[in-house]
From Swiss-Prot:
A Pfam family the protein falls into: DUF167
Protein name stated in the entry: UPF0235 protein OCAR_4310/OCA5_c02140
Annotated InterPro entries: DUF167 (IPR003746), YggU-like_sf (IPR036591)
Family label: Belongs to the UPF0235 family.
SUPFAM superfamilies in the cross-refs: YggU-like
Organism: Afipia carboxidovorans (strain ATCC 49405 / DSM 1227 / KCTC 32145 / OM5)
Length: 106
């Protein structure tokens, strides 16, 4: 299974699948979609109304990766459960933090 994130010059782009009203804000590992792509499974407490779920996802990643909230943005999929999250920072450090947060064995 490939990592669900891509390294870029200024950070990483993470593919996520969001479950709103999931009971708690958490990362639940990595999942393979039917099309063969890997995504980080994320659940948030809030409903997908008025951008609340997107805000919760960006805040969750900011906290997990210890980056400012302003460095985490929804790059695509604003109204979809499948999203691309752009995170600015050192790509190597972000990749290591993502591996730890998703419990990937190196």
């Amino acid at each position: 299974m490939t990592d669900p994130w891509r390294y870029a010059t200024h950070g990483v782009m993470v593919a996520v699948r969001v479950t709103p009203r999931g009971g708690r804000d958490a990362v639940d590992g990595i999942e393979m979609l039917a099309n063969g792509k890997s995504v980080v499974k994320v659940r948030v407490r809030v409903a997908a109304e008025g951008g609340e779920a997107n805000r919760a996802v960006t805040e969750l990643f900011a906290g997990l990766l210890r980056v400012p909230k302003s460095k985490v943005k929804v790059a695509s999929g604003v109204t979809s459960r499948i999203k691309q999250i752009a995170i600015e920072g050192d790509p190597k450090q972000l990749g290591e933090a993502l591996k730890a947060a998703t419990s990937i064995e190196s």
